[in-house]
């Protein structure tokens, strides 16, 4: 059997084979490569070899692909219900490459400790039903707004690269307690994140952490020393906007991790919303501008 590699983006041989044949294990692949049951361009290959469009993978006809059936996945009623909402109620935009949803606050993007329901777990149900959705970025559980989901592997690679190359511009709205000294400005810091610890600001000249850059603009003065601020992150560090708001002296309303509970008004919700995303035409051939409506509690606070 001959497989013509059709992806324009290089991929490790073992990962490429696993996408085609999910039942193939790493051990089986490496053994087949050692025995030349699987070759690339008629040459012996390593599992780490990167294959790309134009390459040919040869699989010996006598090589037995695994025939056992995968275990039946079990999904909860909540995951099935959420999967339906992702493709209906939460859906903002869809094309051949991606979908964009308006994630509500309180819903996790990915699973974790004490998290039983997430966007990712619902996508697994949709993929079980024949889709090929892949997360390409995340929002904090308490953050609402625009979340992009790739429709296939190639689109996910393009979007991952686009985020790295700064071809995706995201804009957030936040209600903060207090305001920066300047109404328009830029925040630069290092953000350090150790495994199992909460992200923290470190000195810009420190060797610890990674550089984080955020632009901001004060849009409106509200009551009770609250302000509406627009944040545009240049980098994408964990909790970046929440930490930078705190660094500016104006923590986000409802942020119980980085805010000052003793002086800030109590809020059930955290007022941080991913409002706009602009995708450069360099990603999929045309520029796309997407917007997610503010949640009801956010709109009510602004009036």
Curated annotation (Swiss-Prot):
The keyword Chloroplast does not apply. It catalyses: uridine(955/2504/2580) in 23S rRNA = pseudouridine(955/2504/2580) in 23S rRNA. It comes from the Bacteria. GO terms for biological process: enzyme-directed rRNA pseudouridine synthesis. Residues 11-70 form the S4 RNA-binding domain. One of its GO terms (molecular function) is RNA binding. Its EC number is 5.4.99.24. The active site is at 140. It is an enzyme of class 5 (isomerase). Keywords: Isomerase, RNA-binding, rRNA processing. InterPro entries: PsdUridine_synth_cat_dom_sf (IPR020103), PsdUridine_synth_RluA-like_CS (IPR006224), PsdUridine_synth_RsuA/RluA (IPR006145), RluA_PseudoU_synthase (IPR050188), S4_RNA-bd (IPR002942), S4_RNA-bd_sf (IPR036986). Pfam families: PseudoU_synth_2 (PF00849), S4 (PF01479). Belongs to the pseudouridine synthase RluA family. Responsible for synthesis of pseudouridine from uracil at positions 955, 2504 and 2580 in 23S ribosomal RNA. This is Ribosomal large subunit pseudouridine synthase C. It comes from Rickettsia conorii (strain ATCC VR-613 / Malish 7). The lineage of its organism: Bacteria, Pseudomonadati, Pseudomonadota, Alphaproteobacteria, Rickettsiales. The gene is rluC.
